[in-house]
């Protein structure tokens, strides 16, 4: 569903309003005062979040974010505040960054927070967008789209609810019994709610959802408001780990370094184990890689997850850069050329159907594509203005530098064996010496996961990839990434990368002349006439072995403890190795998957709101493959 931005409008007295819904965004007596009286105080805050590890708020109707800014402001002012504040909010018609700035200027006391929000305001694409603010301690998860479709897909465990859509008379869908029933499913134990609405239908629907509601004095001349508390223990995600926040991460490539960084951001101590002498020396060691999504006409799972992964990855890269860490990357843009006229027509239809924001994706005809590439091209294609090239080794290193007091690296130590005990997991080296122990272990060791007996159920295959390097003259094109059944990237330190080959179950570590020729042929297909000027005597390159999955999606989650399961078995009922997780199967899209996969896994382990819709989380579950073979269940020996 395309996202149509809200249109900025005001009533005669200057109150922000929606012409589409015929209602105002806040009480005429003051939006900030209403947020503090109805929603913050109405949910017993700040007292209820004090002393907590994390606290989650779910809001229906983000509007222009005034409730969020007021809550963030109250959290900052509270010396007893929780360690991490999660604020999850759904909005069908979000404002543009420019209109947000116009609206937020009315409250100068919130200016620093509003500016930080504006700096990180996401591209207006459908689905979930996770933003880390206030040095990562305030996490805003925005759901852009229809709440009736999105809330049933959310996994949250909310401690408080802000019900702040337009009035039931103007926007009845947001107050329907079916939608309010989802709040009961999403409620954590002891969850509260507050809303300015005292509609009888709303209160009856909330009661049916498990909330005991009461009327209370209202705000701005409104006689009453509604407060409630959930009667039963909620079914949101619970912490999956032991009280000791300590994890082993096996592997220091994109998967492992990203996971270590996301756990450390939550205050976890992490031991990273890798046989190499430093981070990013295996499949994550290429000179440059590409960060961009893969749209589809039907917006399938791959399209949705690559969109979420690319946008979250960009957010993560910007935060590392803002922190002064030496990650090398450039959002120069990615040009994805059509393979042929049929594919070109399909690319046009994708853009016409989904109407994405122009700062995310647009179709460019041949002449504009040629201008962007700096080279005459035979076809047009997709242009991703925010697409980027990234140096994977620098990203791995930057991830591990974020929390030097919490991340300890054991380089040059190959894990030979992983053993479970009553206290968790211990990794041993080839001499039988313990490297480190922790209650939680994460397998992020690429194709090495195939040698771990506990992960025998995971169908990870090795895909050999060869990238070609050649000297690039200063100022030579292209200065953007160009893809067409291969890719060529801007030069880094005078060297340009082109590739890559993809050969499954091929263990040859040396460069092959035939693969160099294949990559030059791909380069010629991308930029006709370009390869002729490449000095073949100066060719170099690199070989890596990428962990691939059968369905081109990564594996993120707890490792199954059985080799097969009945197809009717729900994923949640498949036996797992307690405290053992995998981040695997990245294939050729490691940069797209890594940051989001790590955030998903860390959120699951910590019992926090998840950053992806439930069906997409299930699509990444390592146990999904067990439901595809023959019937029956066999436990590992």
Curated annotation (Swiss-Prot):
In the N-terminal section; belongs to the methyltransferase superfamily. tRNA (mnm(5)s(2)U34)-methyltransferase family. It comes from Aromatoleum aromaticum (strain DSM 19018 / LMG 30748 / EbN1). The gene is mnmC. InterPro entries: FAD-dep_OxRdtase (IPR006076), FAD/NAD-bd_sf (IPR036188), MnmC-like_methylTransf (IPR008471), SAM-dependent_MTases_sf (IPR029063), tRNA_MAMT_biosynth_bifunc_MnmC (IPR023032), tRNA_MNMC2 (IPR047785), tRNA_S-uridine_synth_MnmC_C (IPR017610). Its EC number is 2.1.1.61, 1.5.-.-. It comes from the Bacteria. GO terms for cellular component: cytoplasm. One of its GO terms (biological process) is methylation. The keyword Methyltransferase applies. One of its GO terms (molecular function) is oxidoreductase activity, acting on the CH-NH group of donors. NCBIfam families: MnmC_Cterm (TIGR03197), PRK01747.1-2 (NF002481), PRK01747.1-4 (NF002483), tRNA_MNMC2 (NF033855). Catalyzes the last two steps in the biosynthesis of 5-methylaminomethyl-2-thiouridine (mnm(5)s(2)U) at the wobble position (U34) in tRNA. Catalyzes the FAD-dependent demodification of cmnm(5)s(2)U34 to nm(5)s(2)U34, followed by the transfer of a methyl group from S-adenosyl-L-methionine to nm(5)s(2)U34, to form mnm(5)s(2)U34. It is found in: Cytoplasm. Its cofactor is FAD. Keywords: Cytoplasm, FAD, Flavoprotein, Methyltransferase, Multifunctional enzyme, Oxidoreductase, S-adenosyl-L-methionine, Transferase, tRNA processing. Residues 1-231 are annotated as: tRNA (mnm(5)s(2)U34)-methyltransferase. Residues 250-637 are annotated as: FAD-dependent cmnm(5)s(2)U34 oxidoreductase. Its main location: cytoplasm. It catalyses: 5-aminomethyl-2-thiouridine(34) in tRNA + S-adenosyl-L-methionine = 5-methylaminomethyl-2-thiouridine(34) in tRNA + S-adenosyl-L-homocysteine + H(+). This is tRNA 5-methylaminomethyl-2-thiouridine biosynthesis bifunctional protein MnmC.
């Amino acid at each position: 569903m395309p996202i149509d931005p809200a249109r900025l409008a005001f009533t005669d007295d200057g109150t922000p309003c929606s012409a589409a819904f015929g209602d105002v965004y806040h009480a005429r007596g003051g939006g900030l005062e209403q947020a503090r009286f109805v929603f913050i105080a109405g949910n017993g805050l700040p007292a209820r979040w004090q002393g907590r590890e994390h606290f989650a708020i779910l809001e229906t109707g983000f509007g222009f974010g005034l409730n969020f800014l007021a809550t963030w402001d109250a959290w900052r002012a509270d010396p007893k505040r929780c360690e991490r504040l999660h604020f999850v909010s759904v909005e069908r018609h979000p404002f543009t960054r420019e209109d947000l700035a116009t609206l937020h200027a009315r409250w100068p006391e919130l200016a620093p927070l509003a500016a930080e929000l504006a700096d990180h305001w996401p591209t207006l694409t459908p689905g979930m967008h996770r933003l880390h603010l206030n040095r990562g301690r305030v996490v805003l998860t925005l759901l852009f789209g229809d709440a009736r479709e999105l809330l049933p897909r959310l996994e949250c465990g909310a401690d408080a609810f802000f019900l702040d859509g337009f009035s039931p008379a103007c926007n009845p869908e947001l107050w329907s019994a079916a939608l309010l029933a989802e709040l009961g499913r999403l409620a954590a134990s002891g969850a509260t709610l507050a809303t300015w609405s005292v509609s009888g239908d709303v209160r009856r629907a909330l009661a049916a959802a498990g909330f005991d509601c009461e009327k209370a004095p209202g705000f701005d001349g409104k006689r009453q408001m509604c407060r409630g508390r959930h009667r039963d223990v909620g079914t949101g995600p619970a912490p999956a780990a032991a009280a000791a926040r300590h994890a082993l991460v096996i592997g220091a490539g994109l998967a492992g370094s990203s996971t270590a960084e996301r756990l450390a951001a939550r205050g976890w101590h992490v031991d990273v184990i890798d046989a190499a002498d430093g981070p990013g020396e295996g499949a994550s060691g290429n000179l440059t890689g590409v960060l961009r999504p893969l749209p589809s006409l039907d917006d399938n799972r791959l399209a949705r997850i690559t969109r979420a992964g690319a946008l979250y990855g960009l957010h993560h890269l910007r935060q590392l850069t803002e922190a002064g860490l030496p990650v090398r990357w450039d959002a120069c843009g990615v040009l994805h050329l059509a393979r042929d006229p049929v594919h070109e027509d399909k690319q046009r239809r994708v853009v016409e159907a989904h109407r994405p924001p122009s700062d995310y994706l647009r179709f460019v005809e041949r002449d504009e594509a040629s201008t962007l590439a700096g080279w005459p091209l035979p076809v047009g294609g997709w242009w991703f203005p925010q697409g980027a090239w990234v140096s994977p080794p620098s990203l791995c290193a930057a991830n591990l530098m974020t929390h030097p007091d919490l991340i300890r690296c054991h380089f040059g130590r190959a894990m030979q064996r992983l053993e479970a005990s009553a206290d968790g997991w211990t990794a041993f080296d080839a001499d039988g010496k313990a490297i480190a122990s922790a209650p939680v272990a994460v397998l992020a060791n690429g194709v090495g996961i195939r040698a771990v007996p506990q992960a025998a159920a995971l169908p990870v295959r090795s895909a050999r990839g060869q990238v070609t390097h050649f000297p690039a003259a200063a100022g030579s094109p292209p200065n953007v990434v160009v893809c067409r059944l291969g890719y060529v990237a801007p030069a880094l330190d005078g060297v340009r990368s082109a590739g890559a080959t993809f050969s499954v179950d091929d263990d040859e570590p040396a460069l092959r002349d035939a693969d160099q020729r294949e990559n030059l042929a791909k380069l010629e297909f991308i930029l006709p006439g370009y390869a002729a000027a490449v000095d073949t005597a100066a060719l170099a390159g690199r070989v890596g072995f990428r962990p691939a999955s059968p369905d081109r999606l990564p594996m993120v989650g707890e490792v199954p403890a059985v080799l097969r399961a009945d197809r009717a078995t729900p994923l949640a009922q498949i036996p797992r190795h307690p405290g053992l997780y995998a981040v695997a199967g990245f294939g050729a899209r490691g940069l797209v998957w890594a940051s989001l996969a790590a955030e998903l896994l860390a959120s699951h382990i910590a019992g926090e709101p998840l950053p992806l819709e439930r069906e997409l989380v299930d699509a990444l579950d390592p146990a999904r493959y067990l439901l595809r073979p023959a019937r029956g269940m066999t436990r590992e020996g």
